[in-house]
Amino acid sequence: MTLNLCVLTPNRIVWDSEVKEIILSTNSGQIGVLPNHAPIATSVDIGILRIRLNDQWLTMALMGGFARIGNNEITVLVNDAEKSGDIDPQEAQQTLEIAEAALRKAEGKRQTIEANLALRRARTRVEAINAIS
């Protein structure tokens, strides 16, 4: 038995295919979803989406949004998403270093919050590349 997973951003469809299982980062922690999962709607945190296709795991960096699960269909609507294979490792590492430097230099509450968000996004992209597939 499989699940139909659809990952959408405002600009494009990132994924629309059947999967065996997913592990999704929500604001209250990670959840695993298998076929016949109870229906839920949840917020999606900045984090990794792990996708199992038969015996292979793929990863994707998600930049926050919402997910709806029900009737063996998962719809994930996020601000942005990147498949790990589409992320340039050098660019991701540079972005992480820039985000870390920006956080160190942040002055005031607003700059600190924005720098922390940029750092979380950058870390997520690096984690997606380094995740065990």
Swiss-Prot record:
Q: How does it sit in the membrane?
A: Peripheral membrane protein
Matching entries from InterPro entries are given as:
ATP_synth_F1_dsu/esu (IPR001469), ATP_synth_F1_dsu/esu_N (IPR020546), ATP_synth_F1_esu_C (IPR020547), ATPsynth_dsu/esu_N (IPR036771)
Q: Which domain of life is it from?
A: Eukaryota
Which Gene Ontology terms of cellular component type are present?
chloroplast thylakoid membrane; proton-transporting ATP synthase complex
Location in the cell? Plastid, Chloroplast thylakoid membrane
Entry's Gene Ontology molecular function annotations: ATP binding; proton-transporting ATP synthase activity, rotational mechanism
The answer, when asked if Plastid is one of the entry's keywords, is yes
Q: Which UniProt keywords apply?
A: ATP synthesis, CF(1), Chloroplast, Hydrogen ion transport, Ion transport, Membrane, Plastid, Thylakoid, Transport
Q: Do you know which Gene3D superfamilies this protein is assigned to?
A: 6.10.140.480, F0F1 ATP synthase delta/epsilon subunit, N-terminal
User: Does the keyword field hold Ion transport?
Assistant: yes
What does this chain do? Produces ATP from ADP in the presence of a proton gradient across the membrane.
Q: Which NCBIfam families match?
A: ATP_synt_epsi
Q: How does it assemble?
A: F-type ATPases have 2 components, CF(1) - the catalytic core - and CF(0) - the membrane proton channel. CF(1) has five subunits: alpha(3), beta(3), gamma(1), delta(1), epsilon(1). CF(0) has three main subunits: a, b and c.
Indicate the family of this protein: Belongs to the ATPase epsilon chain family.
What is the name attached to this protein's record? ATP synthase epsilon chain, chloroplastic
